[in-house]
Amino acid sequence: MKFAKISQVAHYAPEQVVTNDDLAQIMDTSDEWISSRTGIKKRHISHHESTSDLATRVALDLLKKSEISAQDLDFIIVATITPDSLMPSTAARVQANIGAKKAFAYDLVAACSGFVFALSTAEKLISSGAYQKGLVIGSETLSKVVDWSDRGTAVLFGDGAGGVLLESTSDQHFLAEIQKTDGSRGESLTSCLMGLQSPFAQTEDDEKYLTMDGRAIFDFAIRDVAQSIKDTIEASPLEVDEIDYFLLHQANDRILNKIAKKLSVSRDKIPANMMEYGNTSAASIPILLSECVEQGLVKLDGSQKILLSGFGGGLTWGTLIVTI
């Protein structure tokens, strides 16, 4: 029987950094106002680089670290809500950029849950026995879709990409998962396609940008997401104290504090990096995972149990427990 495992990680963020003090120069806000409410201190902003450029850097780094060729890849999945274009897909652009001629490639759209949804999908592809190796990447350039005059959203988001190499193995590494969607609450967090106009229909300016009902999303995260994490642990062969780290979507530090209390888990087991990157949507979890490996928290030697949980637009939320 075939299984899948995460064998390598990588991440990339644009060089340009915008601090809270920088934002205070262009809108009515302050470092204290932003950081006390979100934990965010700065974010990386793409200037000339596109979503596929960021994802390509991650893909090349994964190949280099793994010492494999692009020709060894069977598939590439990119989770994003900020694609370069509707077609070709961001994943197709990455496939061309790295020369992975044998790989099929497609995008997956599930907002801040995108990486978890994509990783679950990729695990099924490899476990089927039909494929051996694939890249799963979360990549976003959210700076291009936020309204920079709206301090309620503009201060939250940043650009970046992260990803993993998934490979076939004879041992089970994916231990449990739960994925959910509630489209009836979808209007709580929206992002429309900018620049699309028709002589038969007009688009209002306020429909062109990312919008969010912050209170609704906060309540959703601490209620539904926390319960989903509990349910996933119960569906696994593990107890909560057997999980080494909880890598959650980096939306807001207060959300992480609330979830930690609901799970009765020490915050030391819930790493955070939103202070450096802000909310990078589908990229947040793989960036965090890659940084945890760099810092030596996660070993990539098959000895640790890691919980990954994403939540966001759709509304969508999903949790995976994996051996890494």
UniProtKB/Swiss-Prot annotation:
It is found in: Cytoplasm. The keyword Repeat does not apply. Residues 250-254 are annotated as: ACP-binding. Disulfide bonds: none annotated. It catalyses: malonyl-[ACP] + acetyl-CoA + H(+) = 3-oxobutanoyl-[ACP] + CO2 + CoA. Its main location: cytoplasm. Keywords: Acyltransferase, Cytoplasm, Fatty acid biosynthesis, Fatty acid metabolism, Lipid biosynthesis, Lipid metabolism, Multifunctional enzyme, Transferase. SUPFAM superfamilies: Thiolase-like (SSF53901). One of its GO terms (cellular component) is cytoplasm. CDD domains: KAS_III. It is an enzyme of class 2 (transferase). GO terms for biological process: fatty acid biosynthetic process. GO terms for molecular function: 3-oxoacyl-[acyl-carrier-protein] synthase activity; beta-ketoacyl-acyl-carrier-protein synthase III activity. The keyword Acyltransferase applies. Pathway: Lipid metabolism; fatty acid biosynthesis. Its EC number is 2.3.1.180. InterPro entries: ACP_syn_III_C, ACP_syn_III_N, FabH, Thiolase-like. NCBIfam families: fabH, PRK09352.1. The last Arg residue of the ACP-binding site is essential for the weak association between ACP/AcpP and FabH. Homodimer. Belongs to the thiolase-like superfamily. FabH family. PANTHER family: 3-OXOACYL-[ACYL-CARRIER-PROTEIN] SYNTHASE, BETA-KETOACYL-[ACYL-CARRIER-PROTEIN] SYNTHASE III, CHLOROPLASTIC. This is Beta-ketoacyl-[acyl-carrier-protein] synthase III. The gene is fabH.
